[in-house]
Amino acid sequence: MRTKIKQLFAKSAEYADKEVEIYGWVRTNRAQAQFGFLNVNDGSFFESLQVVYDSALENFSDISKYRVGVSVHIKGIVKLTPDMKQALELHASSVEMLGDCPEDYPIQPKRHTREFLREVAHLRARTNLFSAVFRIRSVAAQAIHEYFQSNGYLYVHTPPVSYTHLTLPTIR
């Protein structure tokens, strides 16, 4: 059964030493001779989950070549790491690529200018900047709606008015 990364971080003690299944996109991949690290994000949480994979996996050489943006399905055991930078990590028992990503995928693990992100508007939601902006806007909108609802206001969603719906006089 799928577990969201947000759940793993929120209830890490409950998931300790248990097998979980996650789906997400590779943010980074650092491979070494005997093991490697994938940072995977599923969009449910700002933080990425570090996945540790080792040479015991039959597709180790394939995993070590996964690029940024590849979609994956991973099964593994959650290990708490209180002395490390991250609170927990996932030790992979299987890693499966669901969708490849082209070599020229524009969103790489580096800082991008806002001008560049305007050019790839369909991908900017996958960046940390826009992920944070969307989360803040969501919380702010919810707070505003709750305030007005609790004070007896009615929310009316009016249709947009555009000039294509209006009849304009013709000038001769």
Task: List where the protein language model places each region.
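OB-fold nucleic-acid-binding modules
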Residues: M1-Y23, L98
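Residue-level marker of beta-strand positions
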Residues: E19, S71-H73
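Short beta-strand segments
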Residues: V20-I22, E47-V51, L88
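Short, surface-exposed secondary-structure boundary micro-motifs
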Residues: W25, I77-V78
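Short solvent-exposed strand-capping/beta-turn motif centered on an Asx-Ser/Thr pair
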Residues: N29-A31
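OB-fold (S1/OB) nucleic-acid-binding surfaces
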Residues: F35-S55
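Extended, charge-rich, solvent-exposed interface segments
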Residues: A56-S71, K79-T158
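Conserved small/polar residues in nucleotide/adenosyl-binding loops
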Residues: T164-T170
